[in-house]
Amino acid sequence: MKLSCLVFLIVSSLVSSSLATAPPNTSIYESFLQCFSNQTGAPPEKLCDVVLPQSSASFTPTLRAYIRNARFNTSTSPKPLLVIAARSECHVQATVLCTKSLNFQLKTRSGGHDYDGVSYISNRPFFVLDMSYLRNITVDMSDDGGSAWVGAGATLGEVYYNIWQSSKTHGTHGFPAGVCPTVGAGGHISGGGYGNMIRKYGLSVDYVTDAKIVDVNGRILDRKSMGEDLFWAIGGGGGASFGVILSFKIKLVPVPPRVTVFRVEKTLVENALDMVHKWQFVAPKTSPDLFMRLMLQPVTRNTTQTVRASVVALFLGKQSDLMSLLTKEFPELGLKPENCTEMTWIQSVMWWANNDNATVIKPEILLDRNPDSASFLKRKSDYVEKEISKDGLDFLCKKLMEAGKLGLVFNPYGGKMSEVATTATPFPHRKRLFKVQHSMNWKDPGTDVESSFMEKTRSFYSYMAPFVTKNPRHTYLNYRDLDIGINSHGPNSYREAEVYGRKYFGENFDRLVKVKTAVDPENFFRDEQSIPTLPTKPSSS
């Protein structure tokens, strides 16, 4: 008789100790498959679409489907020995236990938007656990204003679509998360999560009320069974350091029947510098119903190089109220009624995803996962706590033109963000004025091309230093940047992790380390920038 997954997990400690050392490559697949079969009760022949060795016809398409940075999609990019395309929670449990028994590194990938490929690349022998099939979304509008259980493999577009579908007859609801619809919910939320309602509602994790995670022992834990410390840690500290996130329960938020969006662009000869300078004083302090993203991009106009400044906005209200507000607070913007479009909230989701015809297309477009789609890119991030002078902005614009293709994206905080304690979640940056994303994209492959663009990105990062936070220079976990430090997981693991950990988490790093030490003392869940365990104290002789 086939035993249940639970029974097999209970007896997992009986797995042969001979598997503690990785077997030869020729038997890795067979060893893992047998372990996986034992854990799940499924015969090996039924697992050919779940456990994928490199020889499988499904291996490359599955691996490539959610590699979102083409830098890591080349013939020389490190490849996992196995991809596990989990179809059930039981598959995730078995993956953790069997990977641990074989002494391999496990990378967990939901949407594949990790900017530096940490969720699917390693220089050590590794397996990839692909969560894209675990994307069930269950919305309950009767639960205290609306809630939803969201599988880690669901995309934000799928989340928004399901909320829209379910709330049609219950008033309009939404969820404060990112504007890119193909981002995976698991990584986005566990890293903090933000979007264009951040000033109204705060971070995505501020609306997480429960979660399910597979721990290092293969157990499925919810908020009650994992305890508040671990629940706190996975709400902004990155879930991959502590286990495998299966799903989050989120609380929905009300949005008005009509919202307003606009885009205004100016170049330097059109007094863009005045607009950019004033933006710093308005965007973080205006009505929390208004989110104004600022983007700076070098462009060519009439054969002359310049910088284009774009303000892209969402206002949770009517156009007339928006015009009254910005005519008074931000005349330098020069906003006109014809710049604005009123629409429903779900239409604004599509508009922010670069669908200019959002008022006529159907929301089903949000269900397009757009697999096997990637460009070459590098991202970095900064936080600003004091407005940059006009001279400083002029300097940065000149350096942008020198860099050629590098763009900056300024995201204002304030509003709800400034009302929440910096220790409420691992995300410590709530009191800043705004966040800056450094964004470099290019089209052509090649090592020399990549080196050139990476060097330009890093050079500009050094030019930005005088204008951003210091000691440490803070950065955002979900804008992963391996330039700020890598953990080799040797004897200096804690010290190496502290370098990047303080930049991502500030003083919250200390609590994250304590949680990590308690729940994963052997550091099974590790990557290039994971949370370390506390250093072992030398024994006294």
From Swiss-Prot:
Domain FAD-binding PCMH-type, residue spans: 76-255
Positions of glycan attachment: N25, N38, N73, N136, N302, N339, N357
Major localisation: secreted
Cofactor(s) in the UniProt record: FAD
Name of the protein in its database record: Berberine bridge enzyme-like 1
Keywords tagged on the record: Cell wall, Disulfide bond, FAD, Flavoprotein, Glycoprotein, Nucleotide-binding, Oxidoreductase, Secreted, Signal
Covalent link 6-(S-cysteinyl)-8alpha-(pros-histidyl)-FAD (His-Cys), residues: H113-C180
UniProt cofactor note: Binds 1 FAD per subunit in a bicovalent manner.
One Gene Ontology term of the molecular function aspect: oxidoreductase activity, acting on the CH-OH group of donors, oxygen as acceptor
EC number(s) given by UniProt: 1.1.1.-
